[in-house]
Amino acid sequence: MVAYSILTLISLGLGSHCASALQYGYNQVPVHKDSDVVAGAFPPINGTHLQSPAFTTPGTVPRDFSDGKAGPTRDEIMDNFLRRLARSNGWMAYHEADFMSEEGRKFPYLYLSGTNSSLENPGSGKKLRVWLQGGVHGNEPAGDQSMLALLGEMAQNQQWTAKVLEKMDILVLPRYNPDGVFYFQRYLATNFDPNRDHVKLARQQTRDIKQLFTKFNPHIATDMHEFSAGRAFGPKKDVIYAADALFSAAKNLNIDEGIRQLSEKLFAKRMGKDIEAAGLRWDPYITQGDSTNSKLLLLEAGTDAKIGRNAMGLTQCVAFLCETRGIGIADQHFERRTLSGLVMAKSIIQTAVDNFDEVYNTIERGIDRFTHSKGSIVLTDKSPISARTFGMLNSTDGKLIDYPIDFASTTPATPVLTRSRPRAYLIPQSWTDVVKRLEVLGLKAEKLPYSYTGRVEALNVTSVAFDKEYYEGVVTATVETKLVEQNMRLPAGTYLLSTTQKNAALAFVALEPEYMDSFASFGIIPVSKGDQYPIFRLK
């Protein structure tokens, strides 16, 4: 077994298949539908009756969906569907967010509660809060369609829904990226990737949705996506992923270990069984790595905080990425794809209901344990590599095969660089923009009315290495520092950010310069070799 550094694994992943050069709008991927041989491995599932607009009102599906130039459900169709459900069900409340997309589109969402609780009045009972989102990438239509199918099924199966809502309140944001859906492209209207903006918070839309998420404060969060269907491997490029579904829990090691184990040992295991029971296939979410030999290297979902599932998980909740096989095949197998997403979402809900006390208590204890922890924080990690097989499909003859691979596992990753957990951070008033970003992430900072004089831990920059590529407006940097203790005087107005907060792990990944997605890495706090980093730590 060998180790593979996470810092070399940063990848846009299975959903990154995009046009080589971006324009304003309509950045659509080429369509390569499955051959008849491959399609035979993904037949319709008997007895499927999905209760979402693409299936209950097929006449509303645009013709361009079959050509891979549009999704199946326009905004107005989705909005009417949500409003109709809310009018017919007292446990369902329709809302429009008080912010708009980059091009001025609305964000409808539904709040589901059996006790009339809401964002403003969440109630005082012992209940789980579950956040479900889809449509982060606009060219992954089974993501938001599976959310609509879930809502439709809950409206149809009132008895099941009543049992669910005894244990939890649910917020469903079906369409995170309405501009991307309009253009049928992965990106926001500004061509930023919405699923890589969770720490740097470059776009206002990201900040607005993040604040809604923080206000809801979920115990469980799920992010619905699709992955590229036709990615081929092997010497003859005749081997493709066989899975209908790929999924991953949040992997960042700054998430409480008890919460991570709950995700892996309870939720992930149950999800795999539920997918198989539905007649579907699954594997862990992976991306392709650069192998040093002829063997295919697949990398399990990484630990980077800029990605949605890890950013959500760093609020100390159970968080899952759920992906279905769909990018690049337009409307092909859409019922099976949507069913795959629905099965995963229902599995998470049902697992939480069936194991309510264990889930609720483990998460609440994990939050308390993390908040008051004095353990070290993890800044870099690595993945052990081992040989295993992965479910593949031979595209020539349609046979399912167990394909030998090298697998870089993050369940769990192995810490490399750790650092003592600070009691607090001191942030000079001149860096108010940094404080505002941290507040969006759900953190609170106190503005000191007096000057601070005393011992601090300062970080002196010993190395800055820039990436070779331009990424979303910046050239990212890998920063190394040396920690030194010294006396410091900081003026009144300096911010004190205590780390005795539930969301403190988001401060760690943002403020510690060595972390791959830190504010220093993204140039929000620019540094050079020899500089003193302008954020200070208290022991």
Curated annotation (Swiss-Prot):
Similarity field: Belongs to the peptidase M14 family.
Cofactor dependence: Zn(2+)
Signal sequence, renumbered to the chain: 1-21
Species assigned in the record: Arthroderma otae (strain ATCC MYA-4605 / CBS 113480)
Glycosylation sites per record: N46, N116, N394, N460
Binding residues annotated for Zn(2+), in chain numbering: H137, E140, H225
Segments of skewed composition (Polar residues): 49-59
Gene Ontology terms describing biological process: proteolysis
Subcellular location: Secreted
Domain Peptidase M14: 71-352
InterPro entries: Peptidase_M14
This enzyme's EC code(s): 3.4.17.-
Keywords of the record: Carboxypeptidase, Glycoprotein, Hydrolase, Protease, Secreted, Signal, Virulence
Active-site residues, as the UniProt record annotates them: E323 (proton donor/acceptor)
Biological role stated in the UniProt entry: Extracellular metalloprotease that contributes to pathogenicity.
Pfam families: Peptidase_M14
PANTHER family documented for this protein: INACTIVE METALLOCARBOXYPEPTIDASE ECM14 (PTHR11705:SF83), PROTEASE FAMILY M14 CARBOXYPEPTIDASE A,B (PTHR11705)
Region of interest: Disordered: 49-72
Gene of this entry: MCPB
Protein name stated in the entry: Carboxypeptidase 2
GO molecular function, one term: zinc ion binding
GO CC terms: extracellular region
Lineage: Eukaryota, Fungi, Dikarya, Ascomycota, Pezizomycotina
Domain of life from the UniProt record: Eukaryota
